[in-house]
From Swiss-Prot:
GO terms for molecular function: CCR5 chemokine receptor binding. Interacts with Sec23/24 complex components SEC24B and SEC24D. Interacts with CCR5. Interacts with ADRB2 in the early secretory pathway. This is Protein cornichon homolog 4. The gene is Cnih4. One of its GO terms (cellular component) is endoplasmic reticulum-Golgi intermediate compartment. It is found in: Membrane; Endoplasmic reticulum; Endoplasmic reticulum-Golgi intermediate compartment. Signal peptide: none annotated.
């Protein structure tokens, strides 16, 4: 059963890694003016909720399966994703708003956040892979 938990977490983490790379590529395209702000933000806002749900499911799964260290490692990122989604101002299009993305260095902060998440998801990927192999060996 433990191997199945880590296999699901590993697959979910792969999806989150690809999503983070997509965020970085799209934001860098906006930074270089290859796409306009409206199309960039609509592309990225489409994937905010799947990222939130995917990471929250893994966090809850680690809580339910009593893997406390991994749960506590995932909790801050899941909390940040939920906070960022809840705190979107009412007039904005979403987390990524085309009218505000060039203001106050938001583009740089979104890019930095995507890079940090990519590093975190890569760390989690190898941690889940190691844990899955360990669970398969112990069974």
């Amino acid at each position: 059963m433990e191997a199945v938990v880590f296999l699901f977490s590993l697959l979910d983490c792969c999806a989150l890694i690809f999503l983070s790379v997509y965020f970085i590529i799209t934001l860098s395209d906006l930074e270089c003016d290859y796409i306009n702000a409206r199309s960039c933000c609509s592309k990225l806002n489409k994937w905010v909720i799947p990222e939130l749900v995917g990471h929250t499911i893994v966090t809850v799964l680690m809580l339910v399966s009593l893997h406390w260290f991994i749960f506590l490692l995932n909790l801050p990122v899941a909390t940040w994703n939920i906070y960022r989604f809840i705190m979107v101002p009412s007039g904005n299009m979403g987390v990524f708003d085309p009218t505000e993305i060039h203001n106050r260095g938001q583009l740089k902060s979104h890019m930095k956040e995507a890079m940090i998440k990519l590093g975190f998801y890569l760390l989690c990927f190898f941690m889940y892979l190691y844990s899955m192999i360990l669970a398969l060996i112990n069974d």
